Structure formats: C-alpha cells, structure tokens
Amino acid sequence: MTIRYPNGKRYNQASQPQKTPIKTHTYSNRGMSLEEELNETNQYYLTHNIACVHKKPTPLQIVKVDYPARSAAVVKEAYFKQPSTTDYNGVYKGKYIDFEAKETKNKTSFPLQNFHLHQIEHMKQVVAHNGIAFVIIKFTLFDEFYLLDAKHIIAFWNRQNTGGRKSITKEEIEEHGSLLSCGYHPRIDYIRVLDTVYFS
C-alpha cells in the first residue's frame, strides 16, 4: 500500500531518521534468583518423589483490571490481603517443613530488617507444633547458600530487640548454619542437609 503526504509526495520509510536504542548494561540475567533456583530444586524433588515442597502463593486483592483485548487482562492495581508468612512449605519424610528464602549482596552480614515480625511469629508457631522451620540465605557475591534453623533466627531477632546488633554476621551463619551444596540437579540440595540436621 502506498502512503502519500497531503502534498502528493510518496512517504518513504527509509528516509526517516532511525532511532537507535540506547544500550543499557544490565546483569540481571547473569544468574538465577534464589526463588528461581529453589523452584527448580523443588520441581526436581517432586519429580523424583523425594519431597513435596511448593512456593506459597501471595494472597492479593485485585482492585483494577484493564482488558486491552478480550483474551488479555492486565492487573493495574492490587493490594496484599494479609501479610504473607514464609515462602515455601511442604512435606518431607512425613514431617511438615516451612522455610523462608532470602538473598543479600552484603559480604560480611545478613540484615535482620529483611525479616518481618509476622514471619518470625510464624516460624515460632511451626516449631511449637513440631514442624521444621528454617531459612535459606544466599550470599550473592559469593554464590553461597546456607540453611539456618529457625531457633537461631529467633535468637538473633531477640538479640536485636534487646539492643544487640541488627544483623547476623556471616561468621555466625557459618557457625550455626549449614553450607548447602550446589549442582545441576538439584540446584540447591537442601534435603541432604535436612537429613543430617533433622533426621539423623
């Protein structure tokens, strides 16, 4: 189809100056996020009948939705219905497991401000009912993963509330936690640590 200007001249798209996109350097796809790595790990455990662990959905109240096409709805505004508890829960060897996944770019410590009071209270309740609660912490700069039992997280949280430091040092995590081995399948083998810490 030929397009013409009002004066009769033909529109030639090639004569228009081309806009060159500005290149921005991003490293966001360099590595997977902790959540993606755990989802992949949990899928491996489920597929191989090792454990049944899933990411908890975040309950949202949808307020505004746009329908640009009949088959496509876009959520424009939503609110959390209630504070979420922890990220993952499931069953392993007949025991309920519940854990939170956290990442930090810090080299020497993990800030406790990454936790919320309702998450700490939830972990306390899981432990009180003989469930297994823990946190998986990733130090992204070192690509290191640690499993830290809820009792230690609760102790460090209480220390903070009584005037102590507002973070957990990496040395404390190394002392009280367990370094997780990483591989191809499963990506983060936290079940192996559960076997030694909780089932031996």
From Swiss-Prot:
Cofactor binding comment, as recorded: Binds 1 Mg(2+) ion per subunit.
**Major location category of this protein:** cytoplasm
The EC class name is: hydrolase
Specify whether Transmembrane is a keyword of the entry: no
Q: Where is the composition biased (Polar residues)?
A: 10-25
Q: Which UniProt keywords apply?
A: Cytoplasm, DNA damage, DNA recombination, DNA repair, Endonuclease, Hydrolase, Magnesium, Metal-binding, Nuclease
Where found? Cytoplasm
For activity, the cofactor(s) needed are: Mg(2+)
Classification via Pfam families = RecU (PF03838)
The record's section on InterPro entries has: Resolv_RecU, Restrct_endonuc-II-like, tRNA_endonuc-like_dom_sf
Site Transition state stabilizer: which residues? Answer: 102
This entry's Gene Ontology molecular function terms read: endonuclease activity; magnesium ion binding; nucleic acid binding
* Recorded superkingdom: Bacteria
What GO biological process terms does the UniProt entry carry, in alphabetical order? chromosome segregation; DNA recombination; DNA repair
Annotated region (Disordered), positions in chain:
1-25
EC identifiers of the protein? 3.1.21.10
Keyword Hydrolase among UniProt keywords: yes
Report which reactions are catalysed by this protein.
Answer: Endonucleolytic cleavage at a junction such as a reciprocal single-stranded crossover between two homologous DNA duplexes (Holliday junction)
The protein's matches in CDD domains, at most eight in alphabetical order, are given as: RecU-like
Chain sites annotated for binding Mg(2+)? 85, 87, 100, 119
GO CC field = cytoplasm
Q: Which family does it belong to?
A: Belongs to the RecU family.
Function (record text):
Endonuclease that resolves Holliday junction intermediates in genetic recombination. Cleaves mobile four-strand junctions by introducing symmetrical nicks in paired strands. Promotes annealing of linear ssDNA with homologous dsDNA. Required for DNA repair, homologous recombination and chromosome segregation.
Q: What is this protein called?
A: Holliday junction resolvase RecU
Record the organism: Bacillus cereus (strain G9842)
Taxonomic lineage from the root:
Bacteria, Bacillati, Bacillota, Bacilli, Bacillales
Instruction: Name the encoding gene, please.
Output: recU
